[in-house]
């Protein structure tokens, strides 16, 4: 049975997979994102930044599996992602504070931005890497303009501090999104169309992952 291993602690990504019929093994990745970004240099484009970060996260989780989870590493697909919002010439990750989230929302209101999600995929068989790929999906997000009181209520919820760009599509932040152009699941943190393509290229069908992963509670390891 081929397991899908999600290298992310993101509740949104887990929900996307569960709603799509997959119950993954969850092993959160531990990558120093600042170090990876610094190594890319100041001229790195958004698609490369998230793609390299996702690949690094997938590689770190794959190394963990081949070292301590060899039964799983005998036949699995590791999926890791990284999302950032590009708007007004700035690449935004998770806000570090409420004040930063407020500043981001004021700059986003009434504008459109591009949500970039890098996807890193590694196929492990017999504790060895047999396939590795990383690609980026892009979705345009059209932001509404929340009232001052609604924005403060949203910031007080704490949701903005947990997600790239300081907003969600599938949570409270969805009230302030006027629309998207492209795949909605990509905004939540994982593009199902891109993941389908990557999985098929490593020799698997998504239906095999449904049968192999659905039906039990998620097993989360930190």
Swiss-Prot record:
InterPro entries (UniProt xref): ITPase-like_fam (IPR029001), Maf-like (IPR003697)
Location in or out of the cell: Cytoplasm
Listed EC numbers: 3.6.1.9
Catalytic activity, reaction form: a ribonucleoside 5'-triphosphate + H2O = a ribonucleoside 5'-phosphate + diphosphate + H(+); a 2'-deoxyribonucleoside 5'-triphosphate + H2O = a 2'-deoxyribonucleoside 5'-phosphate + diphosphate + H(+)
Enzyme class: hydrolase
One of the protein's GO biological processes: nucleotide metabolic process
Molecular function as annotated in GO: nucleoside triphosphate diphosphatase activity
Domain of life: Bacteria
Active-site residues, record numbering mapped to chain: 82
Broad class of the protein's primary localization: cytoplasm
Any GO CC annotation of this UniProt entry: cytoplasm
One Pfam family cited in the UniProt record for this chain: Maf
Keyword terms: Cytoplasm, Hydrolase, Nucleotide metabolism
The protein's required cofactors: a divalent metal cation
Extra remark beyond the main annotation: Was identified as a high-confidence drug target.
Function in brief: Nucleoside triphosphate pyrophosphatase. May have a dual role in cell division arrest and in preventing the incorporation of modified nucleotides into cellular nucleic acids.
Family stated for the protein in its record: Belongs to the Maf family.
Protein's UniProt name: Nucleoside triphosphate pyrophosphatase
Naturally occurring in which organism (per UniProt): Mycobacterium tuberculosis (strain ATCC 25618 / H37Rv)
Biological classification of the source: Bacteria, Bacillati, Actinomycetota, Actinomycetes, Mycobacteriales
């Amino acid at each position: 049975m081929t397991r899908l291993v999600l290298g992310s602690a993101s509740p949104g990504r887990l929900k996307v997979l569960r709603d799509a019929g997959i119950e993954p093994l969850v092993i959160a990745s531990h990558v120093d994102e600042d170090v990876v970004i610094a190594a890319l240099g100041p001229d790195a484009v958004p698609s490369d930044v998230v793609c390299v970060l996702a690949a690094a996260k997938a590689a770190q989780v794959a190394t963990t599996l081949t070292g301590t989870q060899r039964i799983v590493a005998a036949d699995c697909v590791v999926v890791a992602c990284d999302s950032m919002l590009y708007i007004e010439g700035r690449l935004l990750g998770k806000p570090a504070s409420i004040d930063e989230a407020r500043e981001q929302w004021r700059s986003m209101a009434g504008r459109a931005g591009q949500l970039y999600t890098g996807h890193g995929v590694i196929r492990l068989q017999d504790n060895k890497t047999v396939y590795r790929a990383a690609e980026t999906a892009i979705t345009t997000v059209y932001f509404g303009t929340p009232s001052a009181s609604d924005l403060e209520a949203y910031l007080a919820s704490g949701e903005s501090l947990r997600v790239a760009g300081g907003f969600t599509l599938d949570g409270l932040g969805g009230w302030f999104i006027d629309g998207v152009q492209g795949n909605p699941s990509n905004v939540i943190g994982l593009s199902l169309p891109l993941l389908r393509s990557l999985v098929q290229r490593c020799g698997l069908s998504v239906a095999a992952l449904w049968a192999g992963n659905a039906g039990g509670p998620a097993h989360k390891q930190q």
